[in-house]
């Protein structure tokens, strides 16, 4: 029986650069670094973001960008602050997609390795309520 999400692993070209990205944007807490050791496929680091285990492993960046993404929930009043954090690291912010009123505001942005992230100020319940109108 599935009991929850265990972790998310992202392959990144530069562990240190991605560490800064995760810490500055998501307030990630680094909890492990393999250093020069390799216990898995390559050097790796583990982080906690709002209790979620995020693993980054050294490897080649994604060659293509897609809409596959990881979305983190934030409060609506924090959106502008997060957008400034994203801009301060020179991340590419995608234009906002069209939304229906009540769906919650989002910002989408790519990291250095073409992973797409979303910060969303809304909940599943709010979205379902709006879609069922």
From Swiss-Prot:
Where is it located?
A: Cytoplasm
The molecular function terms in GO held by this entry are: metal ion binding
Its domain of life?
Answer: Bacteria
Would you kindly state one Gene Ontology biological process term found in this protein's UniProt entry? response to antibiotic
Q: Which residues bind Mn(2+)?
A: 7, 69, 118
Principal location listed in the UniProt entry: cytoplasm
| Boundaries of every VOC domain copy | 4-122
- Protein name per Swiss-Prot or TrEMBL: Fosfomycin resistance protein FosX
Report the cofactors: Mn(2+)
Role this protein plays: Catalyzes the hydration of fosfomycin.
Q: Which GO terms describe its cellular component?
A: cytoplasm
Entries under SUPFAM superfamilies matching the protein: Glyoxalase/Bleomycin resistance protein/Dihydroxybiphenyl dioxygenase
Alphabetically sorted, this entry's keywords are: Antibiotic resistance, Cytoplasm, Manganese, Metal-binding
Does the record carry Cytoplasm as a key word? yes
Which family, according to UniProt?
Answer: Belongs to the fosfomycin resistance protein family.
Q: Which organism is it from?
A: Listeria innocua serovar 6a (strain ATCC BAA-680 / CLIP 11262)
Active-site residues per Swiss-Prot or TrEMBL entry: 44
Q: Does the keyword RNA-binding apply?
A: no
Q: How does it assemble?
A: Homodimer.
């Amino acid at each position: 029986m599935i009991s929850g999400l265990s972790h998310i692993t992202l392959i990144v070209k530069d562990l240190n650069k991605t560490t800064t990205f995760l810490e500055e944007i998501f307030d990630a807490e680094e909890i492990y670094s393999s250093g020069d050791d390799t216990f898995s496929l390559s050097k790796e680091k583990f982080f906690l973001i709002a209790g979620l285990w995020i693993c980054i492993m050294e490897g080649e960046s994604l060659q293509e960008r897609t809409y596959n993404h990881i979305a983190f929930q934030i409060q609506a009043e924090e959106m502008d602050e997060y957008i400034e954090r994203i801009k301060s690291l020179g991340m590419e912010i995608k234009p906002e997609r069209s939304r229906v009123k009540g769906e919650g505001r989002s910002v989408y942005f790519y990291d250095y390795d073409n992973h797409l992230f979303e910060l969303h100020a809304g909940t599943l319940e709010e979205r379902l309520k709006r879609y069922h109108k």
